[in-house]
Amino acid sequence: LRFNKLTRLSDDFRATTLPYLKNLDLSYNCFSKFPTEPLNSSQLQAIGIRFQRDADGNRILREWPTGITTCPSLIQLQIGSNDIRKVNETLTSQLYILDIKDNPNISIDVTSVCSDIRAGMYKLIYDKTQDIRGCDALDIKR
């Protein structure tokens, strides 16, 4: 569903109508809010929602999807190239591939997954200039 100028998903786009949905890529669309409809799917493993822009090219996805870490089978979230701001959610090692790169205003605490990052069991894709706290194993410029 990439490159379609979508602003929302249909009401039919949910776990009960798509029970075998494993991967969902909504990148390069126009979502200003994270679509939560498919998150209850027991099969969903990866969501990509990178590069959400309005018609003028402005970054419009600013809010972290609250509750994303409780999605039952999600292991990968690609939410880079947006304008995500403060992340108030505690990360879990269940979601072990996280792309937050090119979110210049992000502020996130990764203390809860630092031991997994250090052990190579959690892949955080980030920029060295981002406000990422709680893990000295990362090469962050302050």
Each language-model region and where it sits:
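Short intrinsically disordered, low-complexity coil segments enriched in acidic
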Residues: L1-D11, L18, A55, I108
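C-terminal capping segment of individual leucine-rich repeats
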Residues: R2, R14-T17, L39-S41, T70, ...
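Conserved hydrophobic position(s) of the canonical leucine-rich repeat
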Residues: L6, L21, F31, L44, ...
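The feature encodes a structural signal of leucine-rich repeats
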Residues: L9-R14, F31-E37, L61-G67, I84-T90, ...
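Surface-exposed loop/turn motifs in large extracellular/passenger domains
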Residues: A15-K22, N40-Q45, T70-I75, K123
